[in-house]
């Protein structure tokens, strides 16, 4: 592999140090490695903002690991930035001099506003959804809030509060009491107050979180089978659970890793304050943040309007998927869905996810025809799909698993991107679109009429179509049977003759 295609971004954060190494492939990035170490630099700041020798040593120790990996990468393709703690520390120069010596490359201490801008760029390049967004990143010693549309930011703020500093300030006794949470939330709201009106003025259609706290929340909700949207009600539930645990060392929540537990309550308190103060309805996890912003900045890649479409095109090219057939199936699925508008109300996101599944439905053939749906589900579950959240990936994988043959109803109910009934509806539409497009020619697609009464589907085919297409008739009969096994009613008529 040519080293000139390699890029590295290192973020010396207040809680963790991160390194991202990527390879540029045809205008997009392929992640080669991610290394993260909990350094808790902010915990080493005293009341005079002097960084302790122990904290500096923890940081240098981590950088020695990173340095080994950087030897393979041209210096012009490496960016190392330091954030809140090293902005604050009065003896930052001492740490930075040795850090640069260890890494053999300059370390740039970036301003809070520049950090916010880079975070937004990382989100814009990797996260799907509406263009107008609010981005929230809770770090160890600072919290960034950014509004923007497309690639352009409209307001940028970096606030002096973070999960490590709030831990030391409001949970220093390690007690998870209502009083400690109330103090932490009130302090966070006070910090937010001067900027709240500006953020509300610029507005947003979607809110995304790009921090360890939000990642932890996502993992908790996935583990507990909840849908992936973070809401204030869910945050309050988790706060009550933390209070029940009593002490930080006894904090146990299903899905919360030991590594994230220490700063989880303080991050949770800050997030509750942000939700309350800004009246946020729901938040999802961003696909990238500061490090991705650094990498895309080095590559000078423009932000695409539709990240999901770019991802699907890249995957189709990589796995040599027949794009004409994928489009044929997607067009048919869209046509079938449009006929059910009055009866099956699917929101625009559900429709997009159905069409994404259509785009990738033959990916399993790149492994083998035998067990192709299982191969497809495995690949989608394990591929990096910028623009899609973990729950959305799981839904697409589940739809592909159930695209033909026997239906695994439990898998459709276990995904958490959409309600189970919606997943069933998407699955039925995908199966019918694949079945009727199987001849791989537009001129052979029958004029299908589809109607729904609750969960009963009635499929009307042109007169004599079944008689003239014996294989097609057999496939339709088999599909009716597969659907009946999971108590889905599919009634087929040909002209005026019901079957």
Curated annotation (Swiss-Prot):
<dbReference type="InterPro" id="IPR003695">
    <property type="entry name" value="Ppx_GppA_N"/>
</dbReference>
<comment type="function">
    <text>Catalyzes the conversion of pppGpp to ppGpp. Guanosine pentaphosphate (pppGpp) is a cytoplasmic signaling molecule which together with ppGpp controls the 'stringent response', an adaptive process that allows bacteria to respond to amino acid starvation, resulting in the coordinated regulation of numerous cellular activities.</text>
</comment>
<dbReference type="InterPro" id="IPR023709">
    <property type="entry name" value="Guo-5TP_3DP_PyrP"/>
</dbReference>
<dbReference type="Pfam" id="PF02541">
    <property type="entry name" value="Ppx-GppA"/>
</dbReference>
<keyword id="KW-0378">Hydrolase</keyword>
<dbReference type="GO" id="GO:0015949">
    <property type="term" value="P:nucleobase-containing small molecule interconversion"/>
</dbReference>
<dbReference type="InterPro" id="IPR043129">
    <property type="entry name" value="ATPase_NBD"/>
</dbReference>
<dbReference type="InterPro" id="IPR048950">
    <property type="entry name" value="Ppx_GppA_C"/>
</dbReference>
<dbReference type="GO" id="GO:0008894">
    <property type="term" value="F:guanosine-5'-triphosphate,3'-diphosphate diphosphatase activity"/>
</dbReference>
<dbReference type="GO" id="GO:0015970">
    <property type="term" value="P:guanosine tetraphosphate biosynthetic process"/>
</dbReference>
<dbReference type="Pfam" id="PF21447">
    <property type="entry name" value="Ppx-GppA_III"/>
</dbReference>
<dbReference type="InterPro" id="IPR050273">
    <property type="entry name" value="GppA/Ppx_hydrolase"/>
</dbReference>
<dbReference type="GO" id="GO:0015974">
    <property type="term" value="P:guanosine pentaphosphate catabolic process"/>
</dbReference>
<comment type="pathway">
    <text>Purine metabolism; ppGpp biosynthesis; ppGpp from GTP: step 2/2.</text>
</comment>
<protein>
    <recommendedName>
        <fullName>Guanosine-5'-triphosphate,3'-diphosphate pyrophosphatase</fullName>
        <ecNumber>3.6.1.40</ecNumber>
    </recommendedName>
</protein>
<dbReference type="InterPro" id="IPR030673">
    <property type="entry name" value="PyroPPase_GppA_Ppx"/>
</dbReference>
<comment type="similarity">
    <text>Belongs to the GppA/Ppx family. GppA subfamily.</text>
</comment>
């Amino acid at each position: 592999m040519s080293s000139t295609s390699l890029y590295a971004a290192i973020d010396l954060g207040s809680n963790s140090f991160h390194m991202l190494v990527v390879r540029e492939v045809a205008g997009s990035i392929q992640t080669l490695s991610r290394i993260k170490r909990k350094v808790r630099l902010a915990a080493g700041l005293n009341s005079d903002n002097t960084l302790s020798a122990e904290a500096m040593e923890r940081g240098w120790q981590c950088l020695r690991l990173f340095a080994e990996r950087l030897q393979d990468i041209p210096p012009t393709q490496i960016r190392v930035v330091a954030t809140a703690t090293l902005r604050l520390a009065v003896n930052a120069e001492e740490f930075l001099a040795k850090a640069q010596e260890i890494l053999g490359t300059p370390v740039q201490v970036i301003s809070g506003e520049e950090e916010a801008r880079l975070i937004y760029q990382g989100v814009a390049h990797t996260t799907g959804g509406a263009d107008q967004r609010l981005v929230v990143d809770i770090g160890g010693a600072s919290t960034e809030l950014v509004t923007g549309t497309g690639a352009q930011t409209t307001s940028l703020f970096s606030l002096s509060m973070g999960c490590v500093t709030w831990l030391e300030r409001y949970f220093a006794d390690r007690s998870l009491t209502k009083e400690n949470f109330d103090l932490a939330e009130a302090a966070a709201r006070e910090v937010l107050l001067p900027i709240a009106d500006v953020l509300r003025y610029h507005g947003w259609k979607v809110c995304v979180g790009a921090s360890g706290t939000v990642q932890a929340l996502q993992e908790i909700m996935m583990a507990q089978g909840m849908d992936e949207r973070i809401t204030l009600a869910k945050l309050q539930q988790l706060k009550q659970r933390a209070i029940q645990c009593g002490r930080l060392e006894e904090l146990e929540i299903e899905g919360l890793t030991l590594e994230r537990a220490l700063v989880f309550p303080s991050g949770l308190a800050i997030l509750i304050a942000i939700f309350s103060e800004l009246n946020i309805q729901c938040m999802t996890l961003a696909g990238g943040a500061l490090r991705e912003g650094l990498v895309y900045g080095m590559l000078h890649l423009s932000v695409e309007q539709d990240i999901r479409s770019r991802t699907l095109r890249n995957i189709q090219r990589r796995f040599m998927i027949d794009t004409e057939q994928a489009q044929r199936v997607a067009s048919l699925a869209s046509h079938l869905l449009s006929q059910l508008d009055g009866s099956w109300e699917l929101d625009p996101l559900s429709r997009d996810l159905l069409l994404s599944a259509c785009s990738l439905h033959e990916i399993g053939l790149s492994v083998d025809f035998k067990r192709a749906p299982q191969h497809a589900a495995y690949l989608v579950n394990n591929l990096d799909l910028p623009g899609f959240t973990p729950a959305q990936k799981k839904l697409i994988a589940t739809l592909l698993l159930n695209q033909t043959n026997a239906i695994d109803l439990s898998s459709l109910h276990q995904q958490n991107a959409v309600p189970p009934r919606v997943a069933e509806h998407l699955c039925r539409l995908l199966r019918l679109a694949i079945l009727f497009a199987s001849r791989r020619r537009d001129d052979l697609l029958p004029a299908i009429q589809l109607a729904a009464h609750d969960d009963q589907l009635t499929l009307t085919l042109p007169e004599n179509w079944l008689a003239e297409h014996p294989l097609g008739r057999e496939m339709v009969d088999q599909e009716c049977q597969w659907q009946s096994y999971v108590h889905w009613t599919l009634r087929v008529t040909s002209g005026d003759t019901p079957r």
